[in-house]
Amino acid sequence: MDLFYIVLCGILGTSAMSFAMWFITKEGIANADMIRAIGSVITDDNSAFSTGLIIHYIVGIIVAFVYLLFISLFQPQSLWAYTGIGAMIGLFHGVAFAFLLVVVIAEHHPKESYRNAGLEVALAHLGGHVVYGLVVGLVAGIFAIRIIF
């Protein structure tokens, strides 16, 4: 498998998820500003966005490899199968992350503005992870990406 396709899946999936989270925040549905939340764990508010963006994309590329491993286990035969499997992995990942976000991460965040993570924030992250999985699955299906075991 070519590393290029893993990176492509990660970048496009992370971009789609970031856009979805930005849209949710912009529309006032929930405070889903994940990029600044990630960055503000490490640095001050002035550079939180750029730090969070770099971390988010690096993790997104690494997680894309894991998604592609799981997608390959199912040996999908069509674009719909790739996309559906990606979305299901995103759903499971989103449920796990939303739970951790509400129970653990928000409680210990250094910034007060990110400590209030209720149902809306959890659902926003769940949706963001489903979008990520959809896009990773779609790109994997377009290029018929498989990790051979």
Mark where each language-model region is:
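Juxtamembrane/disordered regions of integral membrane proteins
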Residues: 1-149
